[in-house]
Amino acid sequence: SMQYILLDSWEAGMQNWTDKMIDEFTIRRGYDPSPYLPCLAGRVIGNSDISDRFLWDFRRTLADMFAENHYKAITEYLHDQGIKTYSEASGVSLEILEDVLLCKKYVDIPMGEFWRGIMHPDLMYYQDVRGAASASHIYGKNIVATESFTGGGFDSPQALKETGDYWFTQGVNRIIFHTSAHQPLDTKPGNTMVGTHINRNITSAEQAAPFMNYLSRHSYMLQQGLFVADLVYLLNEGAPSTVPIWGSGLSPAPPEGYDYDYINADALLDRVSVAGSKL
């Protein structure tokens, strides 16, 4: 029977309104947003400080709603059916005002993605994977999955191993191939589409067992034990609250030899304790 549903990266464009938006905002922020809605069209209500405060509240409300009314709601519904969730919640496209770690909190297995080819190890995919690993660590989950080897084409197991090894060092411990098409036809190359092709029609298929066993054993070993970060980077409390996918990355950069996780305000308030002078 079906055990998991996978929610891919959000690629549905920006969503910033719903029929219950006024009610949702009022409950979450404690005041009626109606007088301030012209701020969404660039108007100033009261003064710039008041308008900016409303916009902060509005964006934060959207982030909370994406996490709770989408990812949490889907996960709870599927749990009632005996099904768990994987999700990139919400992915590298950054199409929504999200709290990326909060979105990943509400799925069973948080995911990132990495590509094979010219985008390895492009900053946005590097940060996306580190975000998935951070969500798993700070919210007490032991699996960090990735949409793996996207892009590419007909790469050899040797080339895929090099890429996979790098991402194992960044926190990945479960590989989900992009793409392995379920197809009855033996015509070659078959249904290929985008992604590295992992199916019985590729030339290395009959010799694939050692590589698959290699990935499986690494994944299993990396799922054991407990990650210990030297540093945590607190993400923006407002929205969007996401890992630094664009730009030059972490600032300040961690000292050489030190590892880190990201943390959001939710985890800082609810999952962090202080013993002596240490978090």
List the model feature ranges, each with a label:
Residues 3-4, 9-279:
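Carbohydrate-binding surfaces of carbohydrate-active enzymes
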